[in-house]
Each structure stands twice: as C-alpha cells, then as structure tokens.
Amino acid sequence: MDLLRRVETPAAAMPLNVSFANRNYDLDYDSVQPYFYCDEEENFYQQQQQSELQPPAPSEDIWKKFELLPTPPLSPSRRSGLCSPSYVAVASFSPRGDDDGGGGSFSTADQLEMVTELLGGDMVNQSFICDPDDETFIKNIIIQDCMWSGFSAAAKLVSEKLASYQAARKDSGSPSPARGPGGCSTSSLYLQDLSAAASECIDPSVVFPYPLNDSSSPKPCASPDSAAFSPSSDSLLSSAESSPRASPEPLALHEETPPTTSSDSEEEQEDEEEIDVVSVEKRQPPAKRSESGSPSAGGHSKPPHSPLVLKRCHVSTHQHNYAAPPSTRKDYPAAKRARLDSGRVLKQISNNRKCASPRSSDTEENDKRRTHNVLERQRRNELKRSFFALRDQIPELENNEKAPKVVILKKATAYILSVQAEEQKLLSEKDLLRKRREQLKHKLEQLRNSGA
C-alpha cells in the first residue's frame, strides 16, 4: 500500500507541475538564461536585446524583496461609447466575455487604435485582460516587472490576443451585425469594473465650473457612470488630483501668506488681479482685508484716511524746496546735490514700500512714473537756475534773457579769462605801489633826520 501511495502521489501531482511549467514557461528558463555570464559582458547585453520577453528579475524573490505596491486606479477609458470598436475588442479579449460571433469586422485603423489602447496601459492594467481571481494574474509578466518596463511583454500579450481574436473571427464565418442594446450587455463584469473605476474619479464639473468645449457627449448605448472624458478634461482632471489642494478657483492657490519683499508683493499683486472678490474674502482675515486697500475689495474694506495715502503724501511734502532761501548747511555742487536729494527721495520711497500693504501693479507703475518725473523736473529746474545765475554774472549777457546756453558758456569762459588777466595786472600794480610807498617812507625819514 505504501508503495502504491508513493507511486500515485507523483502521478497525481504531475499534471499540476506540467500545467505550471506550461503556463510559466517564459519565466522558468528563458528569463534566467541571460543571467548566466559567458566570460564577457557583451554576450549578456546581446542576449538581453535578442530576447523578446525579458523581465528584469530572475525569480519571484526580487518581487518579494522590493514589495512594490499595486498600481493606483486609472481613469476610465477615453472611449465614450460601449458600442465602439474598442469596446467590442475588449469584450472579445475578456476571458469572461461571451463569444457571440467574434465582434464584427474592423478596418486596419480600428485594429491599430485597439492596439494603441492596449499598449497605452489603460486596458493592460485593468481586470478585463487578466482575471484577478486567477492564479496567473499574480504571476503575470507585467505585474512581475518590478521596474514597470514590460513594453515587450505587453506587445507579446497584445499580439497573442489579436491572433486569438482573428482566429475566432475566421471560425465564426460571416461577420455578425452591429450590436444593439442587447449586445452591449454581453460583458456585464466589464461594465461593473468600468463603472467602479469611473465612480472613484472626480467629476470635472465639480473641480472646473467652466464648461469644456471639447468634451464628448455620451452615446445612447453608454451607461451614465461610464461617460468618458475628452483628452483636455482628462489631463485637467489628472492635474487637479495631483495638486495638494483643489479649489473651484485654480488660479488662487498659494496666496494665504502676505509677501515680505517688493518682488513677492508684485507677484502677489498680479495674482490678486486675476481672482474674484469672493475668493479673496475667504482667504484673508478681516484685518488683512482692511489693510490691503485693493481697489477690488469694495468701499467698505478701505478706510477714508488709510496710512497708504498718508505715506504717499509724505514722499511729496518732504522733498527739498529749491525755491526757498539757502540754508546754513554746507553747499554742495548742483550735480552732487541733485544726486543726494534723489537718493534721499528713493530711500524714503523704498521704506514706504516695505511698510505699506501690497498694492496693485498699476498703482506701483504710477508711483514709479511719478517719482521719475519729479526727479527729472527737479534736475532740469536746478540746471536752469544755474545757467541763469551764470548769465547774470556776465556783463554782456546780463540783460539778455533769451541767450542760449552755448553762448552763456562761451561768454562766461572769456569773461573769466579777462578777469584773471585784470587780476594779474592789478596785483603787479599793487606791488609797484607798495615799493613806491616804501621808498617814500625811507625818504621822509631821511628828511626828518637832516632837519633836526
């Protein structure tokens, strides 16, 4: 009896091992063969390029070592109707679908579109290609790929499915007519999986209240839960899901903290011009809204005498008055004094910018333009007064109010040279007179001594 049991046990276990070897033949020997080096690295890379199916791991121990999590649920297929050629191909590819005639005849473009969808990953990673209850789903070539680079494996899987689909279509003989509402219910499990995947996604109308012009309308055969999105809405939905916080106004993100520098305030001002009043009032507390004083906040949020207006007046009132009489301070040259005053005004403006609340970009540009105009006007007035003073010192141009600046400069140079020559002449005459005085004094002393 023991001998019979020993003989029957391997015989009973033989079909399991044979079936397992047949199912995982690609993972049994061919996948391990390139890892045996043949004394050269070139042979290893050459064998790896020649092999059509090459998973990155030699055995299941690598998969257990990395312990990769399953892929996240993907968005539903972009195909809007269930009666489309992609759905018919899916129904024929699905192991659970009922084979009711091969799914009809398709053109080359439809077949290429189905292959593109399969290679794109929208159908390879779903449950209608590999049954999750089956043991082969755990040992699938694509799931075994720990680096998710099984493009060749996906290509082979798609080619096998297409071959089986063409064989089924040849066996069916004549193509079946177009599917109606009854044909759409052949793969109810696929509908459940697709509706479950669609229910986990966010409706684009919730995230984006604005209507999408290129959104496709569902066909009559499609279920309400499996309505597909257009490429633009699908990309917007993926970006909204990946963002840390999704709000009805996507332009109003990251605006809760007030800026501290002038560059940050300018960026904040550009963002505040694009958002509406309601979003600003929700994000900013009442104290910040009253201090900001933005023109879009309404009349109640801006006090009649805000510190912003007072500081702007402070810049204009404390400027140097050149029409006032000169003070007792040290007099600098005209150009240097203009530079000092302009630097003082710019320093006051920069301090007021740091202390004031953020303003709009238009107000900032107006302030800069006004400051530049004030400084330029002061420079021109100072230069004009200097020329007028120089003209008044020249005897030839003293009464000529329309004398040009070039004439004033030339006459002033000639007058300075003549004055210097006259000065030298007067100095020489002074020396002669002093010597003459000394001689007369000496002669007077001699006369006094002789008369005594």
Curated annotation (Swiss-Prot):
Keyword Transmembrane found: no
Annotated Low complexity bias: 220-251
Extent of motif UBR5-degron: 368-377
Biased composition (Acidic residues): 264-276
Glycosylated residues in this chain: T71
N6-acetyllysine modification, residue list: K156, K161, K170, K288, K330, K336, K384
Domain of life: Eukaryota
GO BP term, pick one: negative regulation of gene expression via chromosomal CpG island methylation
MF (Gene Ontology): core promoter sequence-specific DNA binding; DNA binding; DNA-binding transcription activator activity, RNA polymerase II-specific; DNA-binding transcription factor activity, RNA polymerase II-specific; DNA-binding transcription factor binding; DNA-binding transcription repressor activity, RNA polymerase II-specific; E-box binding; identical protein binding
Glycyl lysine isopeptide (Lys-Gly) (interchain with G-Cter in SUMO2) cross-link site: K65, K156, K161, K311
Residue stretches of biased makeup (Basic and acidic residues): 279-291, 328-344
Keywords: Acetylation, Activator, Chromosome, Cytoplasm, DNA-binding, Glycoprotein, Isopeptide bond, Nucleus, Phosphoprotein, Proto-oncogene, Transcription, Transcription regulation, Ubl conjugation
Additional facts recorded: Alternative translation initiation from an upstream, in-frame non-ATG (CTG) codon or a downstream ATG start site results in the production of 2 isoforms with distinct N-termini, shown in this entry as isoform 2 and isoform 1, respectively.
Subunit structure: Efficient DNA binding requires dimerization with another bHLH protein. Binds DNA as a heterodimer with MAX. Interacts with TAF1C and SPAG9. Interacts with PARP10. Interacts with KDM5A and KDM5B. Interacts (when phosphorylated at Thr-71 and Ser-75) with FBXW7. Interacts with PIM2. Interacts with RIOX1. The heterodimer MYC:MAX interacts with ABI1; the interaction may enhance MYC:MAX transcriptional activity. Interacts with TRIM6. Interacts with NPM1; the binary complex is recruited to the promoter of MYC target genes and enhances their transcription.
Entry domain remark: The 9aaTAD motif is a transactivation domain present in a large number of yeast and animal transcription factors.
Name used for this protein in its record: Myc proto-oncogene protein
Organism annotation: Canis lupus familiaris
Gene that specifies this protein: MYC
